């Protein structure tokens, strides 16, 4: 919602940082919970591995067109790749006349022989938004095919079609979660061929008493439960950000999702996983990778509040996520 307007303003000072590389303490630690933190800007991250290379994608910077893309062969030395969607697609303005030059909060997954990339275009401060889809058989070779509109929202809707998350149920069926503020997080089943909605729209999380401040859903299935993580409160304000990661779980992908105290996430429930610390402020925009890795951004209080990528292994041994 309004977070993106603030984020755009926040990034005006960032162009000098674009040449820096991401540095992690380990490429793929088997047991160490914390992989490391980046020295580069990345916001609303999603991460995937193709062959021997890691790719991290995020919201585009104000100084760039398209989605930001980073690549590493060892998760220690990262290079900035050509952005995706450097040329705007013509249909975006049909649904979002006032969209910016960058796109927001991508999610990438591999399914049925293709990489599926969901992303958002929106107008600042409103729910005039659209989620789009692109596909490719290879990240490294590019060649992204525009798959068009997935779902949209307007002022007549009670939800906001941004922050997409492709997930799968225990039987391997694809679903899409999305949402930001308004009436909260939505979930819909996808057609396996088109990867677009084919069923009902379910509500799975909301914050009716907190100004609706939640967004950025990510889901995974572990040990008989579906786990939903969301971001609470305010992002995109540097060290003054109050973003935090909250979670709940359900036996059914469509809910109800309950936190550790038993409160429904539709009633504002959510157990806090990460609210930051003295250095890392406002962690959120999270994505669960392969079921056991969590990526998110946080604002570095030791570096002018610049948002950086943090990566942790997730531990599920207690029946709840931890790191």
UniProtKB/Swiss-Prot annotation:
* Cell compartment(s), UniProt: Secreted
State what changing residue 43 to A does: Decrease in binding affinity
Q: Which domain of life is it from?
A: Bacteria
Instruction: Mention any one GO cellular component term assigned to this protein in its UniProt record.
Output: extracellular region
* Induction per the UniProt record: Induced by arabinose and arabina,n and repressed by glucose.
Cofactor(s) recorded in Swiss-Prot or TrEMBL: Ca(2+)
Reported pH dependence: Optimum pH is 6.0. At pH 4.0 the arabinosidase retains about 8% of activity.
Q: Which CDD domains match?
A: GH43_BsArb43A-like
Detail the relationship between temperature and activity. Optimum temperature is 60 degrees Celsius. At 80 degrees Celsius retains about 2% of activity.
Return the InterPro entries for the record. Answer: GH43_arabinanases, Glyco_hydro_43, Glyco_hydro_43_endo_a_Ara-ase, Glyco_hydro_beta-prop_sf
Identification of the protein by name: Extracellular endo-alpha-(1->5)-L-arabinanase 1
What taxonomic classification does the UniProt entry list for its organism? Bacteria, Bacillati, Bacillota, Bacilli, Bacillales
Gene name per UniProt: abnA
């Amino acid at each position: 919602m309004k977070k993106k307007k603030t984020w755009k303003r926040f990034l005006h000072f960032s162009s000098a940082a674009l040449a820096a590389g991401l540095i992690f303490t380990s490429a793929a630690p088997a047991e160490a919970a914390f992989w490391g933190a980046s020295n580069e800007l990345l916001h609303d991250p999603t991460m995937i591995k193709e062959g021997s290379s890691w790719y991290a994608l995020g919201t585009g910077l104000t100084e760039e067109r398209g989605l930001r893309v980073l690549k590493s062969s060892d998760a220690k030395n990262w290079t900035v790749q050509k952005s995706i969607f450097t040329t705007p697609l013509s249909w975006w303005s049909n649904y979002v006349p006032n969209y910016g030059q960058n796109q927001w909060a991508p999610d990438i997954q591999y399914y049925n022989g293709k990489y599926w990339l969901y992303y958002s275009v929106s107008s600042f401060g409103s729910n005039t938004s659209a989620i789009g889809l692109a596909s490719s058989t290879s990240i490294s070779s590019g060649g992204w095919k525009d798959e068009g509109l997935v779902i949209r929202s307007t002022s007549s809707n009670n939800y906001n079609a941004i922050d997409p998350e492709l997930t799968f149920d225990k039987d391997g069926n694809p679903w899409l979660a999305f949402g930001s503020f308004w009436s909260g997080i939505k979930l819909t089943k996808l057609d396996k061929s088109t990867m677009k909605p084919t069923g009902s729209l379910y509500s799975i999380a909301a914050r009716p008493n907190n100004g609706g401040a939640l967004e950025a859903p990510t889901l995974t299935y572990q040990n008989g439960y579906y786990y939903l993580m969301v971001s609470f409160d305010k992002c995109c304000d540097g060290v003054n950000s109050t973003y935090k990661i909250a979670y709940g779980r359900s036996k059914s992908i469509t809910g109800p999702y309950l936190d550790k105290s038993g409160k429904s996430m539709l009633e504002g429930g959510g157990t806090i996983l990460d609210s930051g610390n003295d250095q890392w402020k406002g962690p959120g925009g999270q994505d669960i990778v392969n079921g056991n890795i969590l990526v998110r951004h946080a604002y570095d209080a030791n570096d002018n509040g610049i948002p950086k990528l943090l990566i942790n292994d997730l531990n599920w041994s207690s029946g709840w996520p931890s790191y």
